[in-house]
Amino acid sequence: ADNDHQEKHLSVFSRKAPYSYGWDWGIRMVTSGIWRPVKIRFYDAASINDYHIKQLSLTEHSAELSNELEINNILPQSIQAEIRINYSFEKGEETVISRSVTLQPGLNSIHIPSEVLSPVRWMPNGWGKPALYDFSAQVVFDGKVVAEQSHRIGLRTVRLVNEKDADGQSFYFEVNGIPMFAKGANYIPQDALLPSVTTERYQTLFRDIKEA
């Protein structure tokens, strides 16, 4: 609220980004209304409310993952469905895992394990390639895909190292077992009116940051 450029600090009464009320780098412009595309989604039998790929372990030989889904069965009765997990690396050969499940009416939590052999690790900027895997989850009912959700993920380990040393205690990060000097900067909105920021402006800015 202290950043509010108005005498009466009104920002505490609304759920908006604080910078809308002014900052040392920006004007006060409290906007309202629809500013992103609106979509209406229709479902025949079920929807995937959430899909998360949890990394359980990572070695040079394999990555053990858990595909965690929250599926909403919108029908009034339980249904037999098939859950398909598809994943590939750099649009290469696709691996498919299939499991038959009973979906009760309402929300259902489903956990499906998967394994990536000889995983290629994601690496930070300047260290190597930021390798990404494509994952998708599908709900199949009566032979038809009724819901689908996709993600791109990187496989890597990150560890905060707090160990006693000559000066007291260390504080640094290891990424994939390699000590990393973390550096960065604050990113602020590129315009007081966010819809005026084009995809090209975002791409140009973050490309410049990456190459700096």
Place the predicted regions along the sequence by residue.
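Secreted/periplasmic carbohydrate-active enzymes, especially glycoside hydrolases
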Residues: 1-212
